[in-house]
Amino acid sequence: MSRSPSNPKGTRDFLPSTLSKRNYILDIIKDNFKLFGFLEIETPALEKNSTLLGKYGNEGDSLVFKILNSGDKVKKADVNSLKQNNLSAFIDSISEKGLRYDLTVPLARFVAQHQNELVFPFKRYQIQNVWRADRPQHGRFQEFTQCDADVIGPKSIIQEIELIKLYDAVFSQLGFNDIIFKINHRSILTALANYIGAQNKLNEFISIIDKIDKIGLENVLEEVKKLLNDDSVSKLSTLLIENENSMQTLNDLFGDTSQAKKGIDELTSILEFINDNKCLNNEIKFDITLARGLNYYTGTIIEVVSKSNTAVGSLGGGGRYDNLTSLFNLKNTSGVGISFGLDRIYLEMEEKKMFPDDLDNHFDIVVINFGLNYIKKLYPLIDSLRKKGKKISIYPEKTKLNKQFSYGDKYKATYAILMGENEFNKNEIIIKNMKDGTQSFHSIKEVNSSLF
């Protein structure tokens, strides 16, 4: 018995009703990208493994989808490594390319490759799919769409402020009023690691701290204890529980180190600018536990969460990366960017019924089919109405009226246009209101000139 067809786990098909809602979100994001001066680019779905790997940490690298070589390249497979159970070396021998994990690393490659063709500071936005070999679960997929905005060029906290304001503009326009923009700084995380004795295990420590929203403070402290010792856990616990998110406490603890002072000063300037100008509709706050465990962040870190639904995870995030383009031989070029989690935003809006009611109205008018000659006579009118922006669908065959009206109902058509034999002879049509069932007779000329 044959199995019914299905898509791979962790991926989705999008029905028209779903896609109209996703496009509603995307249109608002795109419009705001343009309002803030960003230009659109695209990069290939495939990147060289040498471009992708080594940029996301060990956990991130393990989630890159690798693509098997084809043709004669398969003959280069390192069979000895496979026999010795060295799977990493074996996979490297049969794969030179992978699916992009995010849009930021491909951007760094793009900027380095096309630097002589770009104007700096270069503000780009990009909306494309990315792939991660993650365990599929609610709000987490193996294929999903990222919507990124980045600035490459001279470093200034104005860029961070503008990106936070961009976030706020989009989420406000989408109807969110319970958003928190969390910010932290990589140098503060480094100072925190030094303070508890984790300076030699910085990446491991940041990876643990980054899990606090998923596994809770108690479990984070337990993992830190395994990594370090009881004294380290005591220091971290005291700081997080008793003086949580106090910039003054951080200044007292770390302010005498130039590295920590840089981060504290930058975040203080960002918060003061935003609070003094009262330019956000949503809340912004400093969060010392915000880590976003990606190895390429070097400065400010940003994350977007909903107060009322933390289960879905972050709705967006980003930060500053000063060294990423240097991996592609473009030195001394800073970057900062943010990403919108389209799929999670969609889930949140769907759960809260935040979408406009008319998004399911796939066309305005359904034309009832009484035969080809009738459609032929109606076609100049149909063509004229389409030029005026009306969305019109002609039922493709002459069949029972109930079936044709049902078709219009299911696609939320507002009106139906009918032309039977009597109307044909009189150059008239019937317009039926699909909402209340009322109908009226009109000349074709009248409809064309004013009715719609």
Regions found by a protein language model. Give the residues of each.
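Auxiliary tRNA-acceptor-end handling modules of aminoacyl-tRNA synthetases
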Residues: 1-22, 76, 83-92
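Positively charged, Gly/Ser-enriched RNA/tRNA-binding surfaces
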Residues: 21-36, 47-48, 83-94, 102-116, ...
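A short beta-strand-loop structural module common to alpha/beta enzyme folds
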Residues: 39-45
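Polyanion/phosphate-binding surface patch
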Residues: 45-97
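Acidic, His- and aromatic-enriched active-site or binding-groove loops in soluble protein domains
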Residues: 62-75, 198-219, 306
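Short, conserved phosphate-binding/catalytic loop or strand-edge motifs used
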Residues: 141-147, 183-191
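Short, surface-exposed recognition loops or helix-turn segments adjacent to catalytic cores
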Residues: 178-188, 205, 284-289
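A generic structural motif
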Residues: 182-183, 205-210, 392-401
